[in-house]
A protein has these predicted regions:
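Short coil/turn segments at secondary-structure junctions
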Residues: 26, 48, 59, 156-163, ...
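Conserved active-site and cofactor/substrate-binding residues in soluble primary-metabolism enzymes
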Residues: 2-10, 30-40, 44, 52-59, ...
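Short, solvent-exposed polar/charged micro-motifs at secondary-structure junctions
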Residues: 99-102, 200-204, 308-311
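ALDH superfamily catalytic-core signature
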Residues: 222-327
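N-terminal Rossmann-like NAD(P)+-binding subdomain of aldehyde/semialdehyde dehydrogenases
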Residues: 2-121, 149, 291
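Residue-level recognition of the N-termini of beta-strands and the immediately preceding loop/turn
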Residues: 57, 187-191, 271-273
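Rossmann-like NAD(P) dinucleotide-binding subdomain of oxidoreductase/dehydrogenase enzymes
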Residues: 110-252
Length: 328
């Protein structure tokens, strides 16, 4: 069989990956006891990833997409069972959305301008090892989506997942590294620690080899990241209202609002959290919500009882977040 240059590059890449695995701190597919060891392993993997061609990175990303679809139901069930939040059916859909819609290397383009004064060329380059904090509300989906985009750019990722979703998070990280190895890439493209804590998060954020931090979570986490002194990307809690006025298709609005706000038990920050309706259509909207979308109009007494449970002691009762209505 004739040997071409591409085949030689693939063979060299595979050998380098195996050498890298042998030299890295011990960890099974990205899982380490110490955060510093996890970062060191990701750093060594990133030296390989950044030298990969776009085609080689895309090959790994394609394998990740395939594995996500194959394991969508498993991860959906794990997430619900471990955290008690959300519902399996919607989480399966979210995993398929991650697999189908997460951008890969196709969005990394070169831009050039030419004119009387010369040529300007803009090339995208990797940050290196990116630190990421992920929530229990959307554990595996966030890890998978983050890694695919970051890997496309030539980066590796160190995660500090929410402790309440560590089993699901580890499963996702194992999946990512298995996909990389199967396609000739290195292990430890995504890493974490066995027992994530606030301390491990601080170690990660302060580490000299972490130039960029991405955080998905509550306002406290996002504030900490954006004030860390490093470059940060924060995705915090959302509280989006749905505004319905007299120009709306009220019937369709009712259906769309219910579909959005009930998706995965209202866990996504982009899901509708309240309705603001003008007086001229409010009765019509309520009619469609109740008669065609299985909504229940609670009495004042029922609202007060629910408020006592959900806002126990004036604070959000986290045991109520993402639960089915019948559980509440």
């Amino acid at each position: 069989m004739p040997i071409n240059e591409n085949m030689v590059q693939e063979i060299v890449q595979e050998v380098m990956a195996k050498m890298q695995i042998a030299d890295a701190p011990t960890g099974k597919h990205g899982i380490f006891k110490e955060m510093n060891d996890a970062i060191e392993a990701a750093k060594k993997s990133q030296l390989i990833v950044k030298k990969m061609s776009m085609d080689q990175r895309e090959k790994i990303i394609t394998c990740i997409r395939k594995k996500i679809k194959e394991n969508a139901e498993v991860m959906a069930r794990m997430g619900v069972e471990e955290t008690g939040m959300g519902n399996v059916g919607d989480k399966i859909l979210k995993h398929h959305l991650v697999a189908d819609k997460t951008p890969g290397t196709e969005v990394i383009t070169t831009t050039a301008w030419s004119g009387d004064r010369g040529l300007t060329l803009i090339e995208m380059g990797p940050f290196g090892v990116i630190g990421a904090i992920t929530p229990c509300t959307n554990p595996s989906e966030t890890i998978l989506c983050n890694t695919m985009g970051m890997l496309a750019g030539g980066n590796t990722v160190v995660f500090n997942p929410h402790p309440a979703a560590i089993k699901t998070s580890i499963y996702a990280i194992n999946l990512l590294n298995e996909a990389s190895l199967e396609c000739g890439g290195p292990d430890n493209i995504a890493v974490t620690v066995e027992k994530p804590t606030l301390e491990t998060s601080n170690v990660m954020m302060k580490h000299k080899d972490i130039p960029l931090i991405a955080a998905t979570g509550g306002p406290g986490v996002v504030t900490a990241v954006l004030s860390s002194g490093k470059r940060g990307i924060g995705a915090g809690a959302g509280n989006p209202p749905a505004l319905v006025d007299e120009t709306a298709d009220v019937r369709k609005a009712a259906t769309d609002i219910v579909n959005g706000c009930t998706f995965d038990n209202n866990l996504p920050c982009i899901a509708e959290k309240e309705i603001v309706a003008v007086s001229s259509i409010v009765d019509e909207l309520m009619h469609y919500l109740v008669t065609e979308n299985d909504c229940y109009l609670a009495s004042k007494e029922e609202q007060d009882k629910l408020t006592e449970v959900v806002l126990a002691g004036g604070k959000l009762n986290r045991k109520c977040v993402g639960r089915d209505a019948r559980t509440l």
